[in-house]
């Protein structure tokens, strides 16, 4: 399923370059790499009024033509024949890994698939001269076709690394094998992802995050080993989808196998074995848990590894000519010369088979979404594949609170308290958001959940506080529990339509004082959290007499006049990076009574400034900006006139 993006580009941009992750009760660290990438890619469209969410949806829907168009230019490295290049681009755009990633809404995998041919073409080398038919026979054209320069390769590697962080070490190894100077191509991606790699490497519990794509996790049915060898990262949902994807994957293996028998070279054998190893590695990595999706363990989505495998098979098939490479060069026809009828017929048949299989996958996807209009939105959101939603997953009341200066959050409850199971999710956006976490935080959340299940104790104070309050609220509700929820800046509580145990959950919430029932909406049943009539806020000032004053701000900072004094409390995890000042005078941090939130002593009223800062954030921003600008300038130089 596709995660949501902020409604405005400015909010996405701020989250991308922040040292604080605005998800749940907040985390210290760099943003998800896909957040950074989407902030950059969507920047040109922001002045047109195109939201990041609409742009991401377009990238998913148009992933097949985008992959075909991007692969067309790099395909010149493999062959000069337009027919061969067309077949290679068509096959690449209909690869099983890409089609399933688009169906499951995994944006990172689709972008990685599109960028991979550019980087591979740079590593393979410059294209050979075109052969033209002259008066004296077949001769080389005086000018070589343009290849992929270092700037284009650097930007492609940035996309690949942001989508699948494990690709950067692999890509750096390939660049080092090509030449030491080529390692400069990996510098922009390395600088951009330094916070991600440091956050993962610093905690062994986060190491599994390297196995998956960035941009969120989702629970899905893993593919069998033979399906992975055919390029499928997940089990097909219908027999039609299985047959169509199987035809494409098996066709790629068959074409590469025939090419291997014809070429009989070490490079061909290495490419074929490398493709099998990449597919096997992808299947093995899919067994690794990398996060939590609802009440389930989410395993690594390894489509980029299967794309690498499929790409190696296509390279081998496209480069096949005859048994000896020297003979191929000697007997190559002109680039636009006529081919034998058998070859042309085989190419046309291959194109028809690919298009038919792609149509089968599309038909299967549309058939699976046929019941979307009659299915509750929350149930659709729990599916592993994407579906159109007839109503928003968040009610208008909750959405308004989120967009207000209080930055209210939503507590979503699922499960059955009669069996001792309550699932609680804290949302800052319209469902799980791209800015909610990072690969490291998701892997750590899974590790903490497993540790808590084994030991019976949650070691993170914020998580323990929310879990205890959510369960108590529906079983033995009291005023203190509602106040605890307000301390987490929970403005509304949602029991979605289609949630399991909704009747028992609703019964418990109706008994709780301090909750105002809004009623039944298209999203589900909604309550406002109002302990003692106080409106929750992300930032508040509590006076010594017990008066609470909400303070307006954004998800990441506060700047404004506050007519109150006492203890300044943030509904964010305590961290030494938080800085607060009143009229330019720094406030002293203090320990909050709840044991998890950030607090400051605020003796006087005045103009409050509250930000989060880390020592590394400014140097990282500057270095990233310089590297990206240099790479973009180098890429644009490829289009200068000769």
Name each model feature, range by range.
Residues 367, 371, 402-483, 575, ...:
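Extracytoplasmic/lumenal acceptor-recognition loop(s) of multi-pass membrane glycoenzymes
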Residues 1-67, 108, 447, 451:
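Membrane-interface coil-to-helix junctions
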Residues 18-28, 32-33, 186-266, 380, ...:
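Periplasmic/ER-lumenal interhelical loops and adjacent helix-loop junctions
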Residues 182-183, 256-288:
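Membrane-interface helix-loop-helix junctions at transmembrane boundaries of multi-pass membrane enzymes
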Residues 534-642:
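Active-site-proximal, structured, solvent-exposed surfaces of multi-pass membrane proteins
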Residues 61-64, 294-329:
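Hydrophobic/aromatic-rich transmembrane helices and adjacent perimembrane loops
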Residues 190, 324-365:
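Signature aromatic-anchored transmembrane alpha helix within multi-pass, membrane-resident enzymes
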